[in-house]
């Protein structure tokens, strides 16, 4: 802290020895050491405070720069948001609104329900349309069609090909085949029951064997009598 050399320190010590004397010199040296220690601690605390203030100032500058950058980014995002909203408004204004919504088709329009099954009304209408035709009309129409077919066949009979001939032979052979009557087969067991000879069961045989192995004469235990 103080730029003192060795010669200067020796000179100061000699002057203090002459002025204070050998009795008070040790106490004065201790007091001077305490003062110098306090002064050094004070200087160290001042340096630490200065360093802290410098660091805080640097941090404050960094914080301000960061806040400025964040504000710029926020402003740019706001500008882009406004631009996008303006462009969307322009696009929506340019579109023509629908005068009316298009007609929505339902499954009932196609004759089925939500699960894809045909509706009962449509099935009934189809069956009614088929049943409306009278049997006499059916027979008349069938007769007319047969008559037309015969007339057309009599007027123009095409030449029979090999394929048609093979089909005709196959059909006539299948029609002329004899009908085989089905033979009924009963699955009821008709075997004659034969009488089974009477035999003892295995359990009874085992019981009889155990009885045979038992000793016939059991030894009686002998009782001891204490002699008094």
From Swiss-Prot:
UniProt-listed Pfam families: TatA_B_E
Domain of life: Bacteria
Keyword Coiled coil recorded: no
Keywords, sorted A to Z: Cell inner membrane, Cell membrane, Membrane, Protein transport, Translocation, Transmembrane, Transmembrane helix, Transport
GO BP terms in the entry: protein transport by the Tat complex
UniProt-listed InterPro entries: TatA/B/E, TatB
Record's compositionally biased regions (Basic and acidic residues): 135-151
Region spans: Disordered: 106-164, 196-228
Protein's UniProt name: Sec-independent protein translocase protein TatB
């Amino acid at each position: 802290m103080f730029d003192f050399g060795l010669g200067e320190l020796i000179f100061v010590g000699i002057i203090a020895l002459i002025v204070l004397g050998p009795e008070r010199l040790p106490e004065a040296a201790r007091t001077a050491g305490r003062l110098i220690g306090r002064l050094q601690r004070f200087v160290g605390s001042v340096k630490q405070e200065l360093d802290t203030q410098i660091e805080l100032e640097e941090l404050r500058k960094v914080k301000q720069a960061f806040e400025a950058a964040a504000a710029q980014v926020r402003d740019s995002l706001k500008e882009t948001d406004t631009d996008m909203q303006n462009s969307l408004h322009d696009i929506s204004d340019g579109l023509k609104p629908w005068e009316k919504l298009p007609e929505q088709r339902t499954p009932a329009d196609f004759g089925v329900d939500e699960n894809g099954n045909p509706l009962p009304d449509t099935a009934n209408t189809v069956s009614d349309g088929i049943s409306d035709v009278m049997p006499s009309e059916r027979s008349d129409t069938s007769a007319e069609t047969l008559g037309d077919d015969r007339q057309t066949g009599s007027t123009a009979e095409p030449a029979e090909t090999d394929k048609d001939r093979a089909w005709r032979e196959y059909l006539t052979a299948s029609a002329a085949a004899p009908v085989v009557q089905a033979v009924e087969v009963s699955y009821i067991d008709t075997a004659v029951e034969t009488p089974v000879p009477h035999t003892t069961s295995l359990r009874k045989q085992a019981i009889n064997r155990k009885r045979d192995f038992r000793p016939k004469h059991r030894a009686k235990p002998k009782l001891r009598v204490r002699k008094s």
